[in-house]
């Protein structure tokens, strides 16, 4: 999590935009995102150059030699943040407006790429050289503080804090999945170098970015020393859809900044007939929106065949089952109501997953996980698409701590179940003998069937009560009499003092 000092610095950056006349949170976050992307291009270009040198691979810097922008050819080094941030305000503004911004819009010549789709209509909106100069100085200070914190999540945490401004403004109702929860889900699924990964409600591409980072960390040599696997990683592995173009633009830049050149990020209503995907993906990672009900006419008919409902959280589960290949896996976040809802649609989708697919795990999370943006209680469902059943014993885990306080402050604390969750999930043989009073335990499929496919952990968890021994009744009564006598004595003394 980011420090209070860093939050204050981001708030100050936001105030610079407001003072310059940019007050729409969506516009502000777009402009900040562009500038962060320009800053990160410089850093990531340097990192890639070093990585290529270490691996003995050739690398062509995007800033090397001369760069053509429109009809003009300029020195590419002037496009680097580390160079132009020292320019006088007027010159910096001119370079940014005339060179840097047009340059980032043309980084991908492939007009079908995610980056090109969502940068084509990007506009540089900072009004004056003075505002740009102040914003660049402020971002330099923010990056300096981020580097001092030196945690892998700090950049993502800054992004989350920026996105919280949208939520606070009441626009779009955006709130992000915490990065440590995303990372936990990715580690549990342990994606391979051959996965085809999809998030049908991708937002800023958090799950896709985390999957890419995990693969680079765990399977770097396997992917980057194999031409076909590297091509798959860069161009075919990652698929994300959303209905918010601002989020898609941020998501596309987020992916590219993390070294994924050409993810398939597309504007799409995943629940409508506009989405043709079927039996396509090997892994779905998602935290779909729980925004209530949809217009039934806008929902794809085949999703309603599994469970006839207007509730998005149920329809997305139906969608996951449709878009997964046989053998494909899913880890998704659902509101608690999905686990125990008594409507026919709730029971139908749970029955479908338990009876016709293979439900593997239900991880109950505390309601504070999404604070300060939302207080909803949620759980993680993990299942595999089989179309012929296979559910045996289902693993339940009762998460009570995630390393942060569960209030609005979300301050770091020592208690953290996440390492234990990952360890236990990856070693199922050790789980079979656990009692239902433990943090985790197995529940046979038949127990779930007998309970109307209820998947809430409290339905199966047992509480161990410790017997309390009280003294005999006569002893308690004697103590009460003694207390009464003491009270009477004190009352007599008080009356004497008051001359009553």
Region annotations inferred by a language model:
Residues 1-193, 264-275, 364-368, 391-405, ...:
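Non-catalytic, mostly N-terminal accessory regions of nucleic-acid modification and defense proteins
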Residues 11, 137, 231, 261-265, ...:
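Short acidic (Asp/Glu) and glycine-rich catalytic loops that position anionic groups and cofactors
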Residues 28, 32, 243-250, 265, ...:
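Conserved Class I SAM-dependent methyltransferase catalytic core
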Residues 42, 204, 246, 272, ...:
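Conserved nucleotide-binding/hydrolysis micro-motifs of P-loop NTPases
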Residues 148, 201, 240-244, 283, ...:
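Hydrophobic alpha-helical scaffolding
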Residues 172-286, 291-295, 301-302, 310, ...:
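Conserved S-adenosyl-L-methionine
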Residues 236-239, 268, 299-305, 364-366, ...:
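Short beta-alpha connecting loops at secondary-structure transitions
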Residues 358-359, 371-421:
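C-terminal, active-site-flanking charged/polar segments
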């Amino acid at each position: 999590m980011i420090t209070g000092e860093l939050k204050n610095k981001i708030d100050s950056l936001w105030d610079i935009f407001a003072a310059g006349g940019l007050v729409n949170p969506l516009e502000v976050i777009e402009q900040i995102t562009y500038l962060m992307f320009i800053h990160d291009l410089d850093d990531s270009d340097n990192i890639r150059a070093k990585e290529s040198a270490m691996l003995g691979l050739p690398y062509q810097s995007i800033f090397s030699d001369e760069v053509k922008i429109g009809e003009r050819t300029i020195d590419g080094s002037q496009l680097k943040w580390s160079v132009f941030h020292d320019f006088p305000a007027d010159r910096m503004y001119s370079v940014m407006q005339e060179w840097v911004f047009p340059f980032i819009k043309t980084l991908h010549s492939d007009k079908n790429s995610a980056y090109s789709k969502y940068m084509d209509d990007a506009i540089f909106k900072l009004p004056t050289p003075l505002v740009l100069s102040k914003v660049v100085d402020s971002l330099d200070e923010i990056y300096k503080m981020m580097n001092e914190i030196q945690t892998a999540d700090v950049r993502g945490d800054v992004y989350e804090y920026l996105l919280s401004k949208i939520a606070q403004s009441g626009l779009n109702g955006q709130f992000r999945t915490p990065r440590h929860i995303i990372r936990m889900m990715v580690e549990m699924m342990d994606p391979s170098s051959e996965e085809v990964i999809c998030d049908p409600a991708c937002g800023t591409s958090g799950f896709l970015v985390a999957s890419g980072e995990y693969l680079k960390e765990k399977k770097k040599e396997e992917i980057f020393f194999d031409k076909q696997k590297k091509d798959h990683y860069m161009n075919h592995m990652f698929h994300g859809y959303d209905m918010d173009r601002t989020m898609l633009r941020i998501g596309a830049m987020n992916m590219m900044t993390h070294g994924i050149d050409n993810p398939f990020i597309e504007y799409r209503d995943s629940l409508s007939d506009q989405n043709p995907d079927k039996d396509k993906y090997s892994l779905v990672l998602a935290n779909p929106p729980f925004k209530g009900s949809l217009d039934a006419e806008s929902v794809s008919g085949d999703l309603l065949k599994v469970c006839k409902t207007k509730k998005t959280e149920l329809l997305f589960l139906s969608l996951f089952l449709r878009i997964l290949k046989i053998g494909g896996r899913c880890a998704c976040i659902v509101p608690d109501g999905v686990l125990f809802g008594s409507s026919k649609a709730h029971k139908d989708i749970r029955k479908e997953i338990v009876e016709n697919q293979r439900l593997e795990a239900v991880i109950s999370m505390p309601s504070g996980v999404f604070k300060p943006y939302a207080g909803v209680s949620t759980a993680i469902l993990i299942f595999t698409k089989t179309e012929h059943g296979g559910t045996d014993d289902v693993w339940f885990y009762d998460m009570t701590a995630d390393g942060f306080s569960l209030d609005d402050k979300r301050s770091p604390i020592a208690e953290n179940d996440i390492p234990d969750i990952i360890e236990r999930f990856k070693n199922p043989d050790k789980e079979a003998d656990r009692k239902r009073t433990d943090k985790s335990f197995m529940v046979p499929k038949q127990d779930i069937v007998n309970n109307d496919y209820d998947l809430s952990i409290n339905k199966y968890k047992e509480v161990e009560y410790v017997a309390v021994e009280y003294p005999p009744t006569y002893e308690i009564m004697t103590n009460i009499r003694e207390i009464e006598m003491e009270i009477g004595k004190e009352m007599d003394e008080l009356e004497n003092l008051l001359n009553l």
